[in-house]
Amino acid sequence: MKEYTGGCHCGAIRFAFHSEESAQMWKCNCSICEMIDYDHLFIKHDLFKLTSGKELIEKYVFETESAKHYFCKLCGIKSFYQPRSHPDSYSIHLKCVDD
Protein backbone atom coordinates (compact mmCIF):
# COMPACT_ATOMS: atom_id res chain seq x y z
CA MET A 1 0.00 0.00 0.00
CA LYS A 2 1.07 3.54 -0.73
CA GLU A 3 0.39 6.66 1.33
CA TYR A 4 -1.35 9.55 -0.41
CA THR A 5 -2.17 13.05 0.80
CA GLY A 6 -4.75 15.60 -0.21
CA GLY A 7 -7.05 18.34 0.93
CA CYS A 8 -9.32 21.19 0.05
CA HIS A 9 -8.56 24.07 -2.33
CA CYS A 10 -7.26 26.53 0.27
CA GLY A 11 -5.18 23.87 2.06
CA ALA A 12 -6.81 24.35 5.47
CA ILE A 13 -8.21 20.79 5.50
CA ARG A 14 -5.57 18.14 4.91
CA PHE A 15 -5.70 14.35 5.05
CA ALA A 16 -3.59 11.26 4.40
CA PHE A 17 -4.67 7.76 3.46
CA HIS A 18 -3.28 4.42 2.35
CA SER A 19 -4.47 2.72 -0.82
CA GLU A 20 -3.42 0.28 -3.47
CA GLU A 21 -2.08 2.06 -6.55
CA SER A 22 -4.63 0.17 -8.63
CA ALA A 23 -7.64 1.31 -6.58
CA GLN A 24 -10.83 1.79 -8.55
CA MET A 25 -12.47 5.20 -8.97
CA TRP A 26 -16.28 5.42 -9.03
CA LYS A 27 -18.74 7.93 -10.44
CA CYS A 28 -21.96 8.53 -8.53
CA ASN A 29 -25.26 9.64 -10.02
CA CYS A 30 -26.79 11.17 -6.90
CA SER A 31 -27.88 14.79 -7.24
CA ILE A 32 -25.04 16.37 -5.25
CA CYS A 33 -22.21 14.30 -6.77
CA GLU A 34 -23.44 14.87 -10.32
CA MET A 35 -23.58 18.63 -9.79
CA ILE A 36 -19.92 18.81 -8.74
CA ASP A 37 -18.58 15.95 -10.90
CA TYR A 38 -17.33 14.07 -7.82
CA ASP A 39 -14.93 11.18 -8.49
CA HIS A 40 -15.11 8.65 -5.62
CA LEU A 41 -12.24 6.69 -4.13
CA PHE A 42 -13.52 4.64 -1.18
CA ILE A 43 -11.01 4.34 1.69
CA LYS A 44 -11.67 2.33 4.87
CA HIS A 45 -11.87 4.48 8.01
CA ASP A 46 -8.77 2.89 9.54
CA LEU A 47 -6.70 3.82 6.44
CA PHE A 48 -7.73 7.51 6.55
CA LYS A 49 -6.37 10.25 8.82
CA LEU A 50 -7.45 13.88 8.98
CA THR A 51 -4.16 15.74 9.53
CA SER A 52 -5.39 19.34 9.83
CA GLY A 53 -8.46 21.52 9.70
CA LYS A 54 -10.96 19.53 11.77
CA GLU A 55 -12.36 22.77 13.20
CA LEU A 56 -12.99 24.10 9.66
CA ILE A 57 -15.23 21.26 8.53
CA GLU A 58 -18.90 22.00 7.94
CA LYS A 59 -21.34 19.08 7.62
CA TYR A 60 -24.25 18.97 5.17
CA VAL A 61 -26.93 16.25 5.02
CA PHE A 62 -30.07 15.89 2.92
CA GLU A 63 -32.96 13.47 2.32
CA THR A 64 -32.18 10.36 4.42
CA GLU A 65 -29.35 12.13 6.29
CA SER A 66 -27.30 8.92 6.15
CA ALA A 67 -24.56 10.45 3.98
CA LYS A 68 -22.45 13.12 5.71
CA HIS A 69 -21.00 15.66 3.27
CA TYR A 70 -18.02 17.56 4.72
CA PHE A 71 -17.05 20.96 3.29
CA CYS A 72 -14.28 23.41 4.10
CA LYS A 73 -15.77 26.51 5.78
CA LEU A 74 -13.18 28.69 4.02
CA CYS A 75 -13.13 27.53 0.38
CA GLY A 76 -16.28 25.38 0.17
CA ILE A 77 -14.62 22.29 -1.31
CA LYS A 78 -15.87 18.81 -0.38
CA SER A 79 -12.64 16.79 -0.39
CA PHE A 80 -14.12 13.74 1.37
CA TYR A 81 -17.38 12.57 2.89
CA GLN A 82 -19.12 9.67 4.61
CA PRO A 83 -21.23 7.90 1.96
CA ARG A 84 -24.36 5.97 2.82
CA SER A 85 -23.35 3.21 0.37
CA HIS A 86 -20.07 2.43 2.21
CA PRO A 87 -20.63 3.00 5.97
CA ASP A 88 -17.17 1.63 6.82
CA SER A 89 -15.34 3.97 4.43
CA TYR A 90 -14.85 7.59 3.51
CA SER A 91 -15.19 8.69 -0.09
CA ILE A 92 -12.18 10.74 -1.11
CA HIS A 93 -12.67 13.18 -4.00
CA LEU A 94 -10.00 11.98 -6.43
CA LYS A 95 -9.50 15.53 -7.72
CA CYS A 96 -8.46 16.60 -4.19
CA VAL A 97 -5.59 14.09 -3.96
CA ASP A 98 -2.11 15.57 -4.38
CA ASP A 99 -0.20 14.61 -7.51
Segments (PLM) and residue ranges:
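A short Gly-Trp-Pro
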Residues: 1-7, 12-99
